[in-house]
From Swiss-Prot:
Belongs to the Fe(2+)-trafficking protein family. The keyword Electron transport does not apply. InterPro entries: Fe_traffick_prot_YggX, Fe_traffick_prot_YggX_sf. It comes from Xylella fastidiosa (strain Temecula1 / ATCC 700964). This is Probable Fe(2+)-trafficking protein. HAMAP family: Fe_traffic_YggX. SUPFAM superfamilies: YggX-like. One of its GO terms (molecular function) is iron ion binding. Could be a mediator in iron transactions between iron acquisition and iron-requiring processes, such as synthesis and/or repair of Fe-S clusters in biosynthetic enzymes. GO terms for biological process: cellular response to oxidative stress.
Length: 90
């Protein structure tokens, strides 16, 4: 049975995640407030950040940066694209 939540990212009722996707309190907040579409959008944005900025998830400072961007992207809608990033043609 699907779980319906009000998604803070999409600003509408939508299908919630099936599991807590991130550790700690932030993971619980994401599980409670972010839907599947919002989480998929974050994963795509995170991949772009890792690739464009040459980040390593093993580096603690890079992980801290990604967590900060996760908060901005999902809850503040203010995450920026990397400097010099050009959107691919659709």
């Amino acid at each position: 049975m699907q779980r319906i939540i009000f998604c803070e990212y999409e600003k509408r009722d939508t299908e919630g995640l099936d599991f807590v996707p991130y550790p700690g309190e932030l993971g619980q907040k994401i599980f409670a407030c972010i839907g599947k579409v919002g989480w998929a959008a974050w994963l795509a944005h995170q991949t772009m950040l890792i690739n464009e900025n040459r980040l390593s998830p093993r580096n603690p400072s890079h992980r801290a940066f990604l967590e900060e961007e996760l908060n901005k992207f999902l809850f503040e809608r203010s995450a920026a694209k990397p400097e010099g990033y050009i959107e691919p043609d659709a």
